[in-house]
């Protein structure tokens, strides 16, 4: 037997140990590379999203919701909790002239129609901006971004400080809504809250969150 490959000899054990260390180093290098690439994708995604949000918020403050609609044809309004970072455009598709066959078009698209992990809040196709009940969907993002921010309503101090939110529809004045109830539920379960929200399209104003982007 070749002494170099015989781990029962000192030389064989050294060769075997070097091989183990080499494969261990190679494995760690691959893991580090994958983690590095994932971190870069995450930071690039965050940077791009921050830029989009800053641009459209600046445009809204400068030109108003009506003029924004001229640039973003699917935009139907703006949703905001004043005094917080919760301030987003609301889109709607699934209707004539607006991606009729895909009412969830903005589930994973930004305001420009490009792929986005975060998506953009959008109004249920069954609603119009003058409906009694506006069902608006948005991702429940970890870190309380987008509709993940609504988790703050679990805290009574936040609720008391921010008891209202506003919605400004294109061509209309800003309307304020009082938060009278906050329900947290599983969107896949037929809980009373989910059943009620599906049936009562003329009752109250609801904000839906999706956990698809947790």
Identify the residue ranges that each predicted region occupies.
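Short extracytoplasmic
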Residues: 57-78
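Exposed alpha-helical structural elements
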Residues: 51, 149, 199-200
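Intrinsic disorder/low-complexity detector
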Residues: 4-8, 126, 213
